[in-house]
Amino acid sequence: MGKWTDKLYITHSEWSGEVGQHSASSGITGRNSSGGFKRLPFYCCSLSLQPFEHPVCTPDGIIFDLMNIIPYIKKYGTNPVTGEKLETKNLIKLHFHKNDKDEYFCPVTYKVFSDHTTIAAIKTTGNVFAYDTLEKLNIKAKHWKDLLTDEPFTRKDIIMLQDPHNLEKKDMSKFDYLKNNKPEELEKRKPINNINVAGMGNTKKVFDELQKKNSNEDDNKAIEKKEEIPTSFHKKRETLPYNAAHYTTGEAAESFTSTVVNAYTASTRALIDEDEFMYKKIKKKSYARIITNYGNINVELFSDKKPKTCHNFIELAKTGYYNDVIFHRNIKKFMIQGGDPTGTGKGGESIWKRYFPDEIKTTLKHDARGVLSMANRGKDTNGSQFFITYAAAPHLDGLHTVFGKVVGGLDVLSKLESIPVDEKDRPEREIKIKQIQMFVDPFEEYQRRLKNKLTHEANAERENEEMRKRREKEEKMGWFGPSVPKIQTSGGGGVGKYLQSTKRDNSEISNEGEELQKKQKITKTTFGNFDNF
């Protein structure tokens, strides 16, 4: 059986390391990591390290700005990245493309370029594409023509500008002119050298001091920003809409799993359709009265079971859509049909100005006299037309949506059934709907409750905000009134910062001394003095 050799303390060799004191930021490992990989973005010039305006590249795919690389080649004649010999005739002009959002993208697939995109260019034309595009449309298809200009090229003409799996060309720590610290190129990148201060006396010194001061301020701001760690109690809680779903829109997952979609990291709640959200809250039935020229028919609507159909019927009735509309079809021992403003049986529309789907439930059937159901032209073609059965019609089950029944006025229904009709089942005497009155409307009640709830929440949020401001104001009040922030003296901090507040004028001290002596002379008496006792 082996022995446990791991010690419960740090040994001397572990502390000392290979070259001295060992810690996460010192020792040979720390020194090697301090000068680690520094990546240059694909849209930056490899010489100025700034975004390029006139991009060109070398045959091995190193990108420069034309205005920067030409003077360098004329002076040194080498590649600033590799240190190898380079001539201006070897430079290849590149044609990058941007979308409406000013982002570089592939002009064929519209894929936005990022640091993780493999980017390639065609040497003969200079057009820049995503390498995936060239691989699918050129290499695998053996179509050796530029996808934009249709100019021929060979496989050797494909230049890799960025390969996420091979970033040696983008490693700034290995750039030749940076490793060798060429003074002219380092000086060119200073902003002060972009200003012509020649012949302006000591202006250059002023600019240098100003630049040093600005850099120190930027460093201090960066440190302060880093120290400000946002916490959950500093953020105002997001108010969700009343119809927010318990699931998200899925945009974040879509952007992470698809290379075509731009990155999206927010978790946004999906919103349920307002009507669909309302239908789930309806638990009551509706009641209405159909007023005809032959009498009144009271109906009960199954709003709790067929909310969409009942909502359509109720809203049409409340807007007067059914006023003065006739029953255009009347078949004895079967049904009476109406709800078409044109009176032809071919018109009528829903409140959404389009057909809406059926709400078929096996528990509600055409199994009795006085069943209220929707007329349609086929599956999911409901509009405004409806019919009332004179007898059971089981052959209509599963084809039409039953959404109510007659609960009063069956004698009026018998009168309507007895009216003679022509050969097209059209009543010979006009049967007209004068009006449809609503007695109980759960949809209107829901809207009223929802409005009151939203108003109450808005008022509560406003009151909470006012209370928070009032509490902050009260906390700022001290024992002797509002707390006044202390004004810092010109002496600043450090040693002796309180000395200035204790300085006094010598004349003031001397005056106080004279007044004190006068008071002592006035109050001095011989009584109680035992000096000569």
From Swiss-Prot:
- Gene Ontology molecular function: any one: ubiquitin protein ligase activity
Give GO cellular component annotations, separated by semicolons. Answer: catalytic step 2 spliceosome
Which Gene3D superfamilies does the annotation name?
A: Cyclophilin-like, Zinc/RING finger domain, C3HC4 (zinc finger)
- Region (Disordered) residue ranges read 454-533
Biased composition of type Basic and acidic residues is found at: 454-477
Q: Which domain of life is it from?
A: Eukaryota
Bias kind Polar residues: ranges: 523-533
Pathway entry: Protein modification; protein ubiquitination
Please identify the protein, giving its name as recorded.
Peptidyl-prolyl cis-trans isomerase-like 2
Species of the source:
Rhizopus delemar (strain RA 99-880 / ATCC MYA-4621 / FGSC 9543 / NRRL 43880)
- Per the record, the gene is cyp14
